[in-house]
Amino acid sequence: MYEKLSAPRQQLVTPLTLTDEQYADAWLKVEYRHKKLLDDAPPFFTENNEHVRSKSEKIIADTLKAAGVPYRYEFPLLMDKNAEDPDFPDYDFCRLHPDFYCLNLRTRQEFAWEHLGMMDDPDYASRAAEKLQLYAENGFFPGKNLIITMETTKKQLSSKIMKEIITTYLK
């Protein structure tokens, strides 16, 4: 109903619920400390002028923007390292910075998106497995509220699959 009012009338009315545009604007205005990039980080900049770590992250960010999906780059999430261990009743928090923290405007559900871009590096793959385990221990599951994409030097990120993921989870 609110969306059907003229702009001058909208200024006189306070809607009971936020429109999608208002909700997205408020969601995007949340301030957070960005993870630092190294001084010699490659110069990959998104359409939103964000300095990202890889060409694949640039592609994901630009595809999210083109699809109208609000996202935060490397938004910090607080995780409990002892969440699943009954022998450690005390909290031991750490921060994970998913590559993208995305908002499905239709459902207003948030998704962490991890792009694992060097899966043919054994050390990287091992750290990725530990990170995914920590996500699961803190209630983030693939297909529920966690999106995972990955690539190796031989198998790059598929733009077709990426667009299907966006349509399935974020539209």
Predicted regions and their residues:
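Short, solvent-exposed loop/turn segments at secondary-structure junctions
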Residues: 77-80, 118, 153-154
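Active-site metal-binding core of divalent-cation-utilizing nuclease and nuclease-like domains
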Residues: 52, 65, 69-106
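C-terminal structured domain segments
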Residues: 119, 123-142, 153
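Basic, glycine-rich
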Residues: 137-171
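Short, charged/polar micro-motifs that form catalytic or ligand-binding hotspots
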Residues: 47-54, 121-125, 151-152
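Short glycine-/polar-rich loops that comprise or flank the Walker A/P-loop
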Residues: 69, 109, 141-144
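Short beta-strand-loop-alpha-helix junction that forms the active-site gateway
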Residues: 97-130
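Solvent-exposed, charged helical/coil patches
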Residues: 1-73
